[in-house]
């Protein structure tokens, strides 16, 4: 941490880029992808085991997770625990209709405010220290924070990647989304 700060101080004349992961969203009150997966597993389990609702409400409880995972494993048609395909598989299984998935993800970010780290990135952008923020998050909080801090976010996604080739002016912050499968738009 201290070496990072020394390097950062030494290079204030060089524009920086930041990569944000799930931790930034979690500090703003948005649940992690891991928790989403377990919520979907719980919903699938409860739709097949209707009389189990009360015990399985707390899907963050380890014994509840073990019980649900045992049931899923015994079905023989679900991905292995912690496998790479769990996220997309369970999102589609829990919400096979794309608009339902969009509504689910929107419900996670609705009324959430960017935590202080987002505001700091915008402040650094105002002082031309940060020029771009790359993110694996679907929440749009860096864009919201840019608006709140009188910056113009230039949103770049996998669908409009050609926008990255542009002259960037002051008061703009490039926000590059590295995901698209279950991203949502809130406008």
What spans do the regions from the language model cover?
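Conserved catalytic-core helix/loop/strand module for nucleotide-ribose chemistry
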Residues: 1-187
């Amino acid at each position: 941490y201290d070496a990072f700060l020394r390097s950062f101080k030494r290079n204030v004349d060089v524009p920086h880029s930041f990569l944000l992961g799930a931790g930034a969203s979690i500090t703003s009150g948005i649940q992690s992808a891991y928790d989403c997966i377990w919520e979907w597993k719980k919903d699938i389990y409860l739709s097949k085991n209707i009389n189990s609702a009360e015990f399985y409400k707390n899907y963050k409880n380890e014994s509840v997770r073990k019980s649900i995972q045992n049931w899923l494993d015994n079905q023989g048609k679900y991905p292995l625990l912690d496998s790479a395909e769990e996220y997309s598989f369970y999102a589609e299984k829990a919400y096979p209709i794309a608009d339902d998935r969009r509504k689910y993800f929107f419900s996670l970010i609705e009324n959430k405010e960017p935590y202080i780290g987002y505001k700091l990135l915008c402040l650094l952008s105002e002082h031309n220290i940060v020029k771009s923020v790359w993110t694996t998050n679907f929440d749009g909080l860096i864009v919201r924070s840019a608006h709140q801090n009188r910056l113009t976010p230039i949103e770049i996604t996998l669908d409009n990647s050609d926008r990255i080739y542009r002259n960037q002016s002051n008061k703009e912050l490039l926000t590059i989304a590295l995901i698209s499968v279950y991203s949502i738009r809130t406008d």
